[in-house]
Amino acid sequence: RRTFAYKLRNKAMNMFSSFENFNLIREKAEASRKAENRPHEVLYFHKVDDPYSHLTVHYIDKFKEAYDVQFKPILVGEENPAALHEPTLYTDYCLEDVKRIASYYDVDFPGKSYPEKKLVDKANSILTAVNPDEFGSVAKTVSHALWSGDLAKLEELEVSCLLYTSPSPRDEL
């Protein structure tokens, strides 16, 4: 049935999703950022046991060199399996896909299978302690050790990160 509420809902949804409205919101946000003299921010969501994160982390430093941005890494955990249509197929595909494409990005991907939970937890604990400015370089090393199954290297990194990383802005709070 086509009712007045139907027409009103369609009008509201069209206004909400319009490209012009999107641009207005973007322009207001950009004007606000400039008025507050804030740099552009890039939020990078990193999942240590995600094969695509292994590829992406190799380009963080290049990205930061190319653009004047404030880089904010955020570690994420497991996704809700209910959100994935076929969770097993998805994880299998991700792993196989990265094995196939890593060489095209000049990235060494040593993973043959997903890392053990113990290694994933160790990698997360290391990256949690890292200053955002050092995240790219440390995360590359951590990721390679994780996907290689190298517990000794992760333990070595954990000790060195805790001893030698500069204080995080979170520590100043």
PLM regions with names:
Residues 36-55:
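Local sequence-structure signature of Cys/Sec-based thiol-disulfide redox active-site neighborhoods
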Residues 48, 54-146:
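Structural alpha/beta surface segment adjacent to cysteine/selenocysteine redox centers
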Residues 156-163:
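An amphipathic alpha-helical core segment
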Residues 1-28:
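N-terminal leader/targeting and pre-domain segments
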Residues 3-7, 11, 97, 137, ...:
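Exposed alpha-helical structural elements
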Residues 147-152:
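Acyltransferase
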Residues 164-173:
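Single conserved hydrophobic/aromatic residue that forms the stacking wall/gate
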Residues 29-34:
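Glycine-/acidic-rich phosphate or pyrophosphate-binding loops and their flanking alpha/beta elements
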